[in-house]
């Protein structure tokens, strides 16, 4: 049930009937304060200006023509021409009843699209570090949201699995006579990487062999391909451990590494030349873009093939977009990559559009994000200034949550305690990130993220346990709530209306890729439930009808909190 969309449609119809153009915008928003109703239509002023009318006069005409029979109990005009809409409590009660029993909390089915989401993208032969966290969890929240709405979502893990470093690694493994790479863990592999690099820099003969292996690997040499495959498999097996711990939906089947596009690269370069988009310049192949200027004010040259015949990230990204449209059949393509890559992506996509590889009707969206910073406002590092490994961060989160939870639950069975600690620790790290606008940098702070009050995962998880505890105490389930829902108190109405706004919120998150909007909504919802719980007797209500009505509101609150947190990839627990 998307109330905002319903009211926008009704107000637009009234505006058009009052003489507004067909493309007018009703600008219906959720009201910031209860005195302004539940929703406010702000579009009258802009339309009145176009029509040369007094806004108040147009607002009066719109209200006369606005048919909200059975939906609104009152419509008021405020200020110069704001239209305040107060929802009818009986109508709200009926919609809550529907949401309780309908699939997906009453969220309307969408016209399904095929949406490719590019996220996580770790490198082979490297352990995941905190720099991979934002892309991984924000991208996964987007994936979960789109899938919940009914879209066909293709997860694309654009793994860094190609490049000159593989010749070096293969040569070093051979040198150490350790071809049985499957026995290695990723930590061994990372040490190998460092030792291989040192040997490469110091031993010219080794460096020559490494370079020869790069050529062999690129030419499809069976031995080199086998060794490369082992390196990729070891890395992805270890990364899967991190994904599982993070409750992220990526699997090995979602890996679409850089190597996937290798065969396309010569064709892309040849095609861009044939279309007159790419030209030779000092031995390299370059696309000059009028949209981007260099420091001399001339069109910027984007290299797609080096003088030595090698390809660049831009070439791969062009092939990647083409593949996602032509082979995967994407209707929309989202990239969760940090903001520093923005110009690079925009240049690649400009070439993609000019070449006609992806039509304008298919959006290419860079959902960029800022950095995770330490308390000093600098990029988050270890005390010694090194990169923080993701596994170490998650270990510390679980350890800190363990102290918090074990202290409060000395009698909880060990298995349940372990599950709760894990859900709270991992949830705290994820929620601290997801609750911030993705476009900004944010400060990583253990104390804030594990706090049991404020907009944190522990608070949200506790809010959920508080709601479900009502049903444990009442000894009832959904099937025993047979009386119709009635709303008599303001706090009931506020909670019920906010519950019905779930579809508006999840639609916004799906459109804009902004999980912090869901976090804010759930936090607000938890606060409204807390106020309702404190001021409205549930189990000892004055009548059975009111008791069941309030239990229904509590039940929809529990379902909405659980579903909302699930779209963020945050686990709920039954008690804390």
Curated annotation (Swiss-Prot):
Query: Where does this one sit in the cell?
Result: Cytoplasm
Q: Which residues form a coiled coil?
A: none
Presence of keyword Cytoplasm: yes
Q: One MF term in GO for this entry?
A: ATP binding
Class of the enzyme per the UniProt entry, highest EC level: ligase
GO annotation, cellular component aspect: cytoplasm
Cited SMART domains: Arg_tRNA_synt_N, DALR_1
**What is the catalytic activity of this protein?**
tRNA(Arg) + L-arginine + ATP = L-arginyl-tRNA(Arg) + AMP + diphosphate
Q: Which UniProt keywords apply?
A: Aminoacyl-tRNA synthetase, ATP-binding, Cytoplasm, Ligase, Nucleotide-binding, Protein biosynthesis
* A Pfam family hit: Arg_tRNA_synt_N
Q: What is its EC number?
A: 6.1.1.19
Motif 'HIGH' region: positions: 122-132
Gene Ontology biological process: arginyl-tRNA aminoacylation
Similarity comment? Belongs to the class-I aminoacyl-tRNA synthetase family.
Q: How does it assemble?
A: Monomer.
Q: What is this protein called?
A: Arginine--tRNA ligase
What organism, scientifically named, is this protein from?
Yersinia pseudotuberculosis serotype I (strain IP32953)
Lineage of this protein's species?
Answer: Bacteria, Pseudomonadati, Pseudomonadota, Gammaproteobacteria, Enterobacterales
């Amino acid at each position: 049930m998307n109330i905002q969309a319903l009211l926008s449609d009704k107000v637009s119809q009234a505006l058009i009937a009052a003489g507004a153009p067909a493309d007018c915008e009703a600008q219906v928003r959720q009201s910031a304060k209860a005195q302004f109703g539940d929703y406010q239509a702000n579009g009258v002023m802009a339309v009145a200006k176009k029509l040369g009318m007094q806004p108040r006069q147009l607002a009066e005409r719109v209200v006369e023509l606005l048919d909200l029979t059975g939906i609104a109990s009152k419509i008021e005009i405020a200020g110069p021409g704001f239209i305040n809409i107060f929802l009818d409590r009986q109508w709200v009660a009926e919609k809550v009843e529907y949401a309780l029993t309908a699939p997906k909390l009453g969220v309307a089915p969408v016209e399904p699209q095929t949406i490719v989401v590019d996220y996580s993208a770790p490198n082979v032969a490297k352990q995941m570090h905190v720099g991979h966290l934002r892309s991984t969890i924000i991208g996964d929240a987007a994936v979960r949201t789109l899938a919940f709405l009914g879209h066909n979502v293709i997860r694309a893990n654009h793994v860094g699995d190609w490049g000159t470093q593989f010749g070096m690694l293969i040569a070093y493994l051979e040198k150490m006579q350790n071809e049985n790479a499957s026995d290695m863990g990723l930590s061994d592999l990372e040490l190998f990487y460092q030792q291989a690099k040192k040997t490469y820099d110091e031993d010219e003969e080794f460096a020559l062999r490494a370079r020869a292996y790069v050529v062999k690997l690129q030419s499809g040499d069976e031995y080199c391909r086998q060794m490369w495959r082992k390196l990729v498999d070891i890395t992805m097996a270890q990364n899967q451990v991190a994904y599982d711990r993070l409750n992220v939906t990526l699997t090995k089947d979602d890996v679409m590494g850089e190597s996937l596009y290798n065969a396309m690269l010569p064709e892309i370069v040849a095609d861009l030349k044939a279309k007159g988009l790419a030209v030779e310049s000092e031995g390299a192949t370059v696309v000059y873009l009028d949209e981007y200027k260099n420091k001399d004010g001339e069109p910027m040259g984007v290299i797609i093939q080096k003088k030595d015949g090698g390809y660049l990230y831009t070439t791969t990204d062009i092939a990647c977009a083409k593949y996602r449209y032509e082979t995967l059949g994407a209707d929309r393509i989202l990239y969760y990559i940090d903001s520093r890559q923005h110009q690079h992506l925009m240049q690649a996509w400009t070439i993609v559009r000019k070449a006609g590889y992806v039509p304008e009707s298919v959006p290419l969206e860079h959902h960029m994000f800022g950095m995770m910073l330490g308390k000093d406002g600098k990029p988050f590092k270890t005390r010694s200034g090194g990169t923080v490994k993701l596994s170490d961060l998650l270990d510390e989160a679980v350890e800190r949550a363990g102290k918090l939870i074990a202290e409060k639950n000395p009698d909880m069975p060990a298995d349940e305690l372990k599950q709760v600690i894990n859900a709270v620790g991992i949830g705290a790290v994820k929620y601290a990130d997801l609750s911030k606008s993705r476009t900004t940098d944010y400060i990583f702070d253990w104390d804030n993220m594990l706090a049991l009050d404020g907009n944190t995962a522990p608070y949200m998880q506790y809010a959920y346990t508080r709601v479900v505890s009502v049903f444990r105490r009442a000894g009832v389930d959904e099937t025993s709530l047979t009386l119709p829902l009635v709303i008599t108190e303001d706090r009931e109405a506020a909670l019920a209306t906010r519950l019905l706004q779930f579809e508006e919120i999840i639609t916004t998150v799906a459109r804009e890729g902004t999980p912090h909007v869901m976090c804010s909504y759930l936090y607000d919802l938890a606060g409204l439930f807390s106020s309702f719980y404190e001021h409205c007797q549930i189990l000892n209500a004055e009548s059975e009808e009111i008791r069941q009505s309030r239990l229904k509101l509590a039940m929809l609150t529990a379902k909405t909190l659980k579903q909302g947190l699930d779209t963020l990839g945050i686990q709920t627990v039954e008690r804390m």
